[in-house]
A protein has these predicted regions:
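Helix-turn-helix/homeodomain-like alpha-helical modules used for DNA recognition
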Residues: 92-120
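Short, amphipathic alpha-helical "recognition" segments used to contact nucleic acids or chromatin
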Residues: 28-47
Length: 120
């Protein structure tokens, strides 16, 4: 993942700002994914709370749940609102300790802005 981030940043370097934007967006998306996965690992294996993991990443506690819901290890524990809660993390830890972690049902995509207006 870090190699892909470096490659995207290398591609952006020296380009006109307009041409650099897609590469910078790719790097930012991959960094966000890396942060989210690190938070998931911290709450699952490091025994960090949602609040503590979020604080370490510079996020509020409310921002952590939706981001954890996009991770490989915790996506299957998201609620109907698309959030991972403290009780879901406790369940995920229990399942992991018993060797039966849930697997995500589908590939998750990162949150992205989607324009409501048609281009043009």
């Amino acid at each position: 993942m870090l190699a892909q981030i470096r490659q995207a940043l290398d591609e952006a370097e020296g380009r006109d700002p307009e041409l650099a934007l897609p590469y910078l967006r790719e790097a930012a998306d991959r960094i966000t994914q890396l942060i989210d996965e690190a938070m998931a690992t911290a709450v699952l294996h490091g025994q960090a709370s949602l609040r503590a993991a979020g604080a370490q990443a510079g996020l509020t506690e409310n921002a952590v749940g939706p981001r954890l819901a996009r991770t490989h290890s915790l996506a299957a524990y998201a609620d109907e609102r698309g959030r991972v809660t403290a009780s879901a993390v406790a369940r995920a830890r229990y399942d992991l300790e018993n060797g039966q972690p849930r697997l995500p049902a589908e590939q998750l995509e990162s949150l992205r802005f989607k324009s409501r207006r048609a281009p043009g």
